[in-house]
Amino acid sequence: MAQLANIGELLSMLDSSTLGVRDDVTAIFKESLNSERGPMLVNTLVDYYLETNSQPVLHILTTLQEPHDKHLLDKINEYVGKAATRLSILSLLGHVVRLQPSWKHKLSQAPLLPSLLKCLKMDTDVVVLTTGVLVLITMLPMIPQSGKQHLLDFFDIFGRLSSWCLKKPGHVTEVYLVHLHASVYALFHRLYGMYPCNFVSFLRSHYSMKENVETFEEVVKPMMEHVRIHPELVTGSKDHELDPRRWKTLETHDVVIECAKISLDPTEASYEDGYSVSHQLSACFPYRSADVTTSPYVDTQNSYGGSTSTPSSSSRLMLFSPPGQLPQSLSSPSTRLLPEPLQASLWSPSAVCGMTTPPTSPGNVPADLSHPYSKAFGTTAGGKGTPSGTPATSPPPAPPCPQDDCVHGSAAQASATAPRKEERADSSRPYLHRQSNDRGLEDPPGSKGSVTLRNLPDFLGDLASEEDSIEKDKEEAAISKELSEITTAEADPVVPRGGFDSPFYRDSLSGSQRKTHSAASGTQGSSVNPEPLHSSLDKHGPDTPKQAFTPIDPPSGSADVSPAGDRDRQTSLETSILTPSPCKIPPQRGVSFGSGQLPPYDHLFEVALPKTACHFVSKKTEELLKKVKGNPEEDCVPSTSPMEVLDRLIEQGAGAHSKELSRLSLPSKSVDWTHFGGSPPSDELRTLRDQLLLLHNQLLYERFKRQQHALRNRRLLRKVIRAAALEEHNAAMKDQLKLQEKDIQMWKVSLQKEQARYSQLQEQRDTMVTQLHSQIRQLQHDREEFYNQSQELQTKLEDCRNMIAELRVELKKANNKVCHTELLLSQVSQKLSNSESVQQQMEFLNRQLLVLGEVNELYLEQLQSKHPDTTKEVEMMKTAYRKELEKNRSHLLQQNQRLDASQRRVLELESLLAKKDHLLLEQKKYLEDVKSQASGQLLAAESRYEAQRKITRVLELEILDLYGRLEKDGRLRKLEEDRAEAAEAAEERLDCCSDGCTDSLVGHNEEASGHNGETRTSRPGGTRASCGGRVTGGSSSSSSELSTPEKPPSQRFSSRWEPALGEPSSSIPTTVGSLPSSKSFLGMKARELFRNKSESQCDEDSVTMSSSSLSETLKTELGKDSGTENKTSLSLDAPHPSSPNSDNVGQLHIMDYNETHPEHS
């Protein structure tokens, strides 16, 4: 709390009127900021500034260095989010960024930038918006790389504020809308200068929508008319603009100058673009009258620089008159010219301007540049600025400049003419007023004595009225035609949007309106509390035409004729020459803001727009102020413009004309001949006409020289502008160099301090190092001792481990001994029960021993009495008894231990026997499981075998049928010869079947057709064998040669029936006569099939399981088949089931049908 109270006292002392106290407190704060790293002090300063607006606190905050920049930005970001403090904190931010701190590059990464953009997107307070936009414009050149992240936000803000300028809410003061419009133009200028490709793309996409077209036409298009085509639009791209490498080589002022180069506005463009500031240097001259009717800015049709002129320029002319007096054209319309003495030699404006002989022929001058200043000042070449008596040889009136041409006029011409529009006459000369375009329609002819510039055409017209009526009518017709051309272009004014006059629009009021506003301006200037400029601007807003955007001109002080006013004006010009304001409000404008102070964003206009021109203005102003203080009469003459020289020329001509009239020998000089209807003498008229013609020729010559000098000046002005820009750049670089030198000095001082501090720290480090080295050595010594001790302990530990290992071994042995001892104890306990008798005997013996001991004692006493020494003998006997007793005990222990060990061995063997029995049971169970599994697998294999056998049997039957058909077809030609043999064979088969088989024969009749189409008789084709019979073949048929189709049928039949004749007791299968022979492959296969068929029928009744494995069955298949054939050779009368061996069927063998198989014979 004490510290907070101390900070409060110091803050109150900051606003002290004593400069020393203030400096001391500021130094204390800076030292505190350098020493303290926390945010508390910065937050306190920000809060105090927001409460009091203290300038010393502002100075401290704007000079903060790292690391307090983060604290300041965080605090500003916090207050930006609050509506109550948003305006004040944005003003503070503007002051901070305006000074371009060293940590300005951190602004792009700080959270303050998104908060500022959000505020500009959502806030509705026009003052806050204006301040925020100006702050953003100031920050953009410092953080150009932020465009890659926030470029769309910048464009959205521009689109929102441009439409805001068009909507113009009624609750907002119009002056603030004017300021907002100025800030939007500055934002347009900055975005177009930095990101032209992206910005033009945004404008194309955003304003191509129907709802934004009006905003484009009213706001954005006039802005675009005042910028050049950016080179990046041709050579660059969107990605290149956002590339950070583009901005690495550019400083902040480089970015600002690059943006300024693309402007066409003479008051906004950079100095090298032909900007002339002579109108700002006119503070050393007494200002002309501010009558709007004499202003060259008001004519939009004939004004050469009308496209870049603003109503603020005419408004400034209105305010150039002192507040306490009316404009001269209104207050003293009949003031007469003060005649000057006629010089001995012919007076020439070129001599007054200090010009030499003009350059060569103007043959190359374009037609539109022949009379630039006459266009710029609303005069024509035909003599609107000359007497009305100009002969017809004068050049014809130049056509008025169209509005489009004026808008798109050359920047060089605009810069060469527009700045000269406000130049003032010499302080020693009276006020002169250039002629207005519509003066001839409004002002009646004045008296001859009124020789002001405005009354000069009437005066000259009175002089020329004595000419003949034809010439007078011609002149009046020419004047009327010229005036009609001027007034026709101004006849249809368009009321601007919003009903107020902003400085971004052109003014083309009619003459009566200008007079009204001029009078109003003079009336306001004469009041006690004069109203500010914008109040007079607001009054004539409804009468102004549709306006075009133009930038803000730097301010100019109000006119004051008195010397005190001159001093005040010079002082104000010196102090505020670089403080532009949107409306160029003079110091009295503070009344409009209520508090008597400038708006909070006024200081930001200096950095929002290019300031090269402002620096040039300040430099030239200082030079001219010095010249005015030294010799204003002589020094200011060369600075006069050609138009002022032309005014002086007309003044000189009027004076010469009056002197010539005074020299004439007229009867009465006061007689007005034209008034009385007469005519003056011819010689006087001729003299006057000659002199007037001479004067007109001189004016034409001077105009020609002025044009040539203007061309030359424009060429030189470009060089001067570039030189001044380079000087300004050098000055900026020098300032930057000075700042860097200051920084270098500061860093050198800090380096020295740091070096001293480093030396102290080095000494402290050395002492600490020595101490640490000694400590390290001590610790190393201790470590070595501890290491030795640890080694000793390690060896001891190893010994202890070895001892423990030995002890464990001994423990195991001891445990074994204990086990044995326990066994022995158990045995001993058993034996002790058996040794009770031995104990009784021992007790008895002990009793006897006691008795004998007593007897022995008696004997000993007797011996002692007899003195014999028997102690040795007794001791030896005792030791002998003891040893024997110990021996017996040890023997007993051994016996007990052996008994225990044998018992334990018996127990172990019994346990092993039980385990083995258990294993045998498990193996038996496993064998039973294996047997059951094998039997299951065997049954599955047999079932598969049976199924495969049936399938094979069916296939073989089909194959045999096919082979039989083939053989039958081959034997058709010999079938007739074999009928007899076939019939006999059939009878024999029938006889055999009736004797040995109880089954009926199934005959198979075959019908065969011969080659001649005859039908053959059918023969039985097969038999069904008995259940126990099996068809077998003899060994002779198995060993016989292969049957071939070439064999005769008789041989085949004889060989086929040989086994049947040789074995009468065996069952003979019933065959068909058409079957193949027994020696052929088909015959063998047929026999095997019949045998297998009968075997399968018998197997269905007697199927048993075989104990052998499937593999053994398959190996012994052939032998079992032969055995089965021998067993089945039974009589058909007594069939019986086959043996169990008949269940084993041989493996199926598929062979070539053309070969014989001896195993299946």
Swiss-Prot record:
Covalent cross-link (Glycyl lysine isopeptide (Lys-Gly) (interchain with G-Cter in ubiquitin)), residues: K30
Polar residues bias: start-end ranges: 509-529, 1064-1077
Gene inactivation effect: Conditional knockout in glia causes an increase in HSP90AA1 ATPase activity and a down-regulation of ULK1, ERBB2, ESR1 and NR3C1 protein levels in the brain.
Topology of this chain in the membrane: Peripheral membrane protein
Keyword Protein biosynthesis included in the entry's annotation: no
Maturation and modification: Phosphorylation at Ser-502 does not affect interaction with TSC2. 'Lys-63'-linked ubiquitinated at Lys-30 by PELI1; the ubiquitination promotes TSC1/TSC2 complex stability.
InterPro entries attached to this UniProt entry: ARM-type_fold, Hamartin
Biological process terms in GO annotation: adaptive immune response; adult locomotory behavior; associative learning; cardiac muscle cell differentiation; cell population proliferation; cell projection organization; cell-matrix adhesion; cellular response to decreased oxygen levels
Entries under Pfam families matching the protein: Hamartin
A GO term for molecular function: ATPase inhibitor activity
Keyword tags: Chaperone, Coiled coil, Cytoplasm, Isopeptide bond, Lysosome, Membrane, Phosphoprotein, Tumor suppressor, Ubl conjugation
Regions of compositional bias (Basic and acidic residues) in chain numbering: 471-484, 1004-1017, 1114-1124, 1152-1161
Compartments, record wording: Lysosome membrane; Cytoplasm, Cytosol
Pro residues bias: start-end ranges: 393-402
Keyword Phosphoprotein: yes
Residue span of region Mediates interaction with WDR45B: 403-784
Region (Disordered): 296-336, 353-591, 1003-1077, 1092-1161
Phosphoserine, modified sites: S484, S502, S508, S518, S592, S595, S1094
Low complexity composition-biased segments: 303-336, 1026-1043, 1103-1113
Xref: PANTHER family: HAMARTIN
Quaternary structure, from the entry: Component of the TSC-TBC complex (also named Rhebulator complex), composed of 2 molecules of TSC1, 2 molecules of TSC2 and 1 molecule of TBC1D7. Probably forms a complex composed of chaperones HSP90 and HSP70, co-chaperones STIP1/HOP, CDC37, PPP5C, PTGES3/p23, TSC1 and client protein TSC2. Forms a complex composed of chaperones HSP90 and HSP70, co-chaperones CDC37, PPP5C, TSC1 and client protein TSC2, CDK4, AKT, RAF1 and NR3C1; this complex does not contain co-chaperones STIP1/HOP and PTGES3/p23.
Domain remark in the UniProt entry: The C-terminal putative coiled-coil domain is necessary for interaction with TSC2.
Role of this protein: Non-catalytic component of the TSC-TBC complex, a multiprotein complex that acts as a negative regulator of the canonical mTORC1 complex, an evolutionarily conserved central nutrient sensor that stimulates anabolic reactions and macromolecule biosynthesis to promote cellular biomass generation and growth. The TSC-TBC complex acts as a GTPase-activating protein (GAP) for the small GTPase RHEB, a direct activator of the protein kinase activity of mTORC1.
Protein name (database record): Hamartin
Organism: Mus musculus
Gene behind this protein: Tsc1
